[in-house]
Amino acid sequence: MASYGMNDVKNGMKILVNAEPAVITDTEYVKPGKGQAFTRVKYRLIKSGRVQEVTMKSTDTLEAADVVDTDMQYLYSDGEYWHFMQQETFEQVQADKNGMGGAEKWLKGEEQCVVTLWNGVPIGVQPPNFVELKITETDPGLRGDTSGGGKPATLETGAVVRVPLFVNQDEVIKVDTRSGEYVSRVK
């Protein structure tokens, strides 16, 4: 397995920490006035999302993780697993609830996603930045009611987003999956 020296470490690199994949989010080289120089490495564990920091001497190394980001098409969910297919090879993988990481509420079928694979197993799914979903349930907007600035709406996938008062049930809206916010109505 490959390893990185402290001079080679950069943001975005995938490493193994205690046999768990992580991505480096920040590195800082520190040279104190007295003593040996060291590097502070901040990383985020891919599976749990926890951020941790470690201080490494310049002679230490970090083990590279065999993590691959692959473009895949979402096919369907059987209730327990979400199935994805690679477009070129038609190879299919299935992700469980932990591997989905909350992305399941934005997927209805045939969306292109970035699936993070570790040893051939999905450990993270990134849905498209914007999705168009139909509103299945929302309160009717009352004329003159502008106090709240919005109302909750349930989408066809079960996700709940805050929408403006003029948006009605059975309309299709565009949602930003990174923030979970309403963007616009779809004509």
Curated annotation (Swiss-Prot):
It is found in: Cytoplasm. Its main location: cytoplasm. One of its GO terms (cellular component) is cytoplasm. Pathway: Protein biosynthesis; polypeptide chain elongation. Keywords: Cytoplasm, Elongation factor, Hydroxylation, Protein biosynthesis. CDD domains: S1_EF-P_repeat_1, S1_EF-P_repeat_2. The modification N6-(3,6-diaminohexanoyl)-5-hydroxylysine is found at residue 34. Pfam families: EFP, EFP_N, Elong-fact-P_C. One of its GO terms (molecular function) is translation elongation factor activity. The keyword Protein biosynthesis applies. One of its GO terms (biological process) is peptide biosynthetic process. May be beta-lysylated on the epsilon-amino group of Lys-34 by the combined action of EpmA and EpmB, and then hydroxylated on the C5 position of the same residue by EpmC (if this protein is present). Lysylation is critical for the stimulatory effect of EF-P on peptide-bond formation. The lysylation moiety may extend toward the peptidyltransferase center and stabilize the terminal 3-CCA end of the tRNA. Hydroxylation of the C5 position on Lys-34 may allow additional potential stabilizing hydrogen-bond interactions with the P-tRNA. Involved in peptide bond synthesis. Alleviates ribosome stalling that occurs when 3 or more consecutive Pro residues or the sequence PPG is present in a protein, possibly by augmenting the peptidyl transferase activity of the ribosome. Modification of Lys-34 is required for alleviation. Belongs to the elongation factor P family. NCBIfam families: efp (TIGR00038), PRK00529.1 (NF001810). This is Elongation factor P. It comes from Xylella fastidiosa (strain M12). The lineage of its organism: Bacteria, Pseudomonadati, Pseudomonadota, Gammaproteobacteria, Lysobacterales.
